[in-house]
């Protein structure tokens, strides 16, 4: 009887360990901030981003950290500005970018906003972890308007303090990953991904390479994922 109990205990332990190892190996469907960041006392909103043929991404918008950025994003979403626009730039192990009416990274809305990040005089406590949403911009610190990106991997060293992070994914990272996996191979840069001569460890050299190889822009218009809508939710989603 004792031997049987020991065998059963060992089997149960093995099953539990297997479950833990399996769950650790699977990418989470949310940014780690969704479980670890305290939102008490903060002004927050939630937005749903619907991407045709891929699914929905729900993001938390932190207006305490980035009030100008969040107000701008909400205004554009409620006006229907994003409806029908596309994710035009996709880079594996970095981010997916959309929100440009020109569909190529050259456009934006009619109004630029002040960049809410440290190098522009605004403290911002949201690091660019996998699942964080942030504003794209040109070389000018106050040039962001409508283009945004969602990190599909951590990019703390290259982006923190330089770009206005304003929220994070609470559900739908699987959608971000699916977009990356399916569409990144359709960029010119994909042919050189993991080429050690052209693609050294993440840092300044990456940006030079991206600029020379189309900057991660999806080559064919038909391959760019379509944003069906972005709507601001009037309820708190479960996550």
Give the positions of each predicted feature.
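Hydrophobic core
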Residues: 12, 16-20
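Cyclophilin-like peptidyl-prolyl cis-trans isomerases
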Residues: 21-239
């Amino acid at each position: 009887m004792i031997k049987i109990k020991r065998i059963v205990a060992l089997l149960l332990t093995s099953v539990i360990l297997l479950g833990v190892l399996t769950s650790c190996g699977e990418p989470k469907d949310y940014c780690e901030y969704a479980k670890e960041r305290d939102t008490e006392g903060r002004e927050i909103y939630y937005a749903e981003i619907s991407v045709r043929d891929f699914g929905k991404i729900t993001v938390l918008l932190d207006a305490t950290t980035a009030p100008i950025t969040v107000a701008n994003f909400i205004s554009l979403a409620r006006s229907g500005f994003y409806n029908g626009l596309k994710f035009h730039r996709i880079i594996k192990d970095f981010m997916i970018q959309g929100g440009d009416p020109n569909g190529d990274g050259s456009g934006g809305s009619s109004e630029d906003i002040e960049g809410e990040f440290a190098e522009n005089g605004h403290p911002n406590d949201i690091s660019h972890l996998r699942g964080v949403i942030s504003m794209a911009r040109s070389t000018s610190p106050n040039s962001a308007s409508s283009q945004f990106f969602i990190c599909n991997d951590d990019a703390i060293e290259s982006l923190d303090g330089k770009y206005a992070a304003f929220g994070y994914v609470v559900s739908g990272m699987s959608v971000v990953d699916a977009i990356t996996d399916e569409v990144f191979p359709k960029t010119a840069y994909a042919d050189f991904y993991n080429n050690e001569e052209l693609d050294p460890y993440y840092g300044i050299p990456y940006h030079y390479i991206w600029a020379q190889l189309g900057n991660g822009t999806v080559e064919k218009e038909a391959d760019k994922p379509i944003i069906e809508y972005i709507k601001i939710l009037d309820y708190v989603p479960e996550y």
